[in-house]
Every structure is written in C-alpha cells, then in structure tokens.
Regions:
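Surface-exposed assembly/interface segments
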Residues: 1-254
Length: 254
C-alpha cells in the first residue's frame, strides 16, 4: 500500500545548439493566441526551444495554414536543433475575417466557440442578449485545435446561462500572399516587412542569418527569387543560403 511516483522523460529532446547556419524563417503563425498579437508581426523573434517558440508566435498543428509551426515542430520535436529566428507576416489587422453570430451550448459552465483563429480583441459574448465582460463574467482558454473555450465565472452575469452567442473576427491565413512574404519598406514610416526584416536580425539579435526559409510559400517563383536575392550581402556584409520548396503539382515544372 502507498503512493508511488515515477518520472517520465519529456517528449521533447533537448535541442543541439549551434549559431552557424542560423535558420531565419518567414511565414505565418497563430498570433491571435498571444496577449499582444500585433507585437509579433514583421519582427525577428529569437527562440531557443519549443516553449519559447509557442510563447513568441503561438502554435497550431495545421501546418498548411501556419507555416512557422511546421518549422517549430521540425526543429524542436523531430530534429532537435536551436536556435532559430521566426518572422511572422500574418497581420491580424489585415489578414482577418468576420465571425457571424454563433450560438454555443453551455456544458458545466463552459461553452466552445468552434472557430479557429479567434481574435479576443473585439470578441462579443452575450447571454440572453446581455453582453458579458471578459475577466468579470467569463475567461477564455485555448484548445489544442485552436478553438476557444468560454468559461463562465461564478457570480458573473452569465453564470446561469445555458447558451451563449458570439460575434467578432478571426485571423485568416489564406489571405497571406506571396507579396506579404516578399515584403518591402514603407516609404513614409520606414517599416520593413516580410523578407526585408532579415536585415534586422544582426543589429537586434547580434546573430548572423545562415539559412533563409519561407516554407510552402517558396514554391512560388516570386518568393523563391526574393529568397535567393536576399542571401547576398545581408547588412552589406554577410552572405547566406536559402532552401526553397519545389512545386510538386503537375504544372510545377512548367
């Protein structure tokens, strides 16, 4: 008789650290899961492990929609290499879609908003047409598939509700195009986007880009050409290589 404990090894192996051949990856991520999604748009983010990566850009297993997550999984769950620099170009202010009013069933004080990519800012939750206040009447948690739990709080206005309604907006990765990956420099503000952000890696992180990638997007000829051009004379000093996708569709060799 008694209580016995055992320690199980984590499923994530400790990554091998090496700054030679530093990966700099441009793509999309579920930044709606962050406290400040806008802060993770078109900036170089250095990550050393899986936890840091998830905290930096969020995570979702839908690799077709969220290309940076595919690299996070490959680097930290499969191969075990670190660090790498992530540049997310999915902008919640631009790449988004409306969520029409949805009715949710409440079970044991929890309702699930069955939409992926929900933006918490601007989300309206109602119980019997009465708007609920986040933090006072309910809290939210993310599910592994990217959907959102609405957890009703005791003493809140919706405590006894059996159904809730939700309206708002969500990020839409399908609206990110090749031009967003290639990026540019805004003439009036000087703000760099897309591959132009590669220039910021050395002055901000004191690390030199070694391998440039834009997974899935680099199957596009324009993105591929931009990647190759960007490998030359980074910060007027450094050189790099790039890895591009090959279009495997029937018209890929045309």
């Amino acid at each position: 008789h008694g209580v016995y404990t055992s320690e199980v090894e984590t499923s994530l192996t400790a990554p091998i650290v090496g700054t030679a051949g530093l990966q700099v990856i441009v793509g999309t991520a579920p930044v709606n899961m962050l406290k400040d999604p806008a802060a993770a748009v078109n900036v170089p983010l250095l990550v050393n492990n899986y936890k840091e990566a998830v905290e930096a850009v969020g995570y979702n297993d839908d690799f077709e929609a969220y290309t940076l997550c595919e690299c996070i999984s490959a680097a930290f769950s499969v191969v075990g290499v670190a660090p790498m620099v992530l540049i997310n170009v999915l902008d919640p202010a631009k790449h988004k879609a409306d969520i029409s009013e949805k009715t949710m069933q409440v079970n044991d004080g929890v309702a699930v908003l069955d939409e992926v990519g929900v933006l918490l800012e601007g989300l309206t939750i109602k119980a019997d047409a009465t708007p609920l206040e986040a933090g006072k009447d309910y809290t939210t948690t993310w599910n592994n598939d990217g959907t959102l739990n609405i957890v009703l709080l005791k003493g809140g206005a919706g405590e006894e509700a059996t159904t809730l309604t939700a309206t708002g907006s969500k990020i839409d990765p399908s609206k990110v195009k090749a031009a967003d990956i290639v990026g540019g420099v805004d003439i009036s503000s000087g703000k760099e986007t897309g591959l132009e952000v590669v220039r910021q890696v050395y002055p901000k992180l004191s690390m030199t880009p070694g391998i440039l990638l834009a997974p899935r997007f680099s199957a596009d000829a324009t993105v591929s050409a931009a990647l190759q051009a960007k490998t030359k004379s980074i910060n007027s000093v450094f050189g790099a290589v790039c890895i591009v996708d090959i279009n495997s569709k029937t018209d890929g060799a045309v």
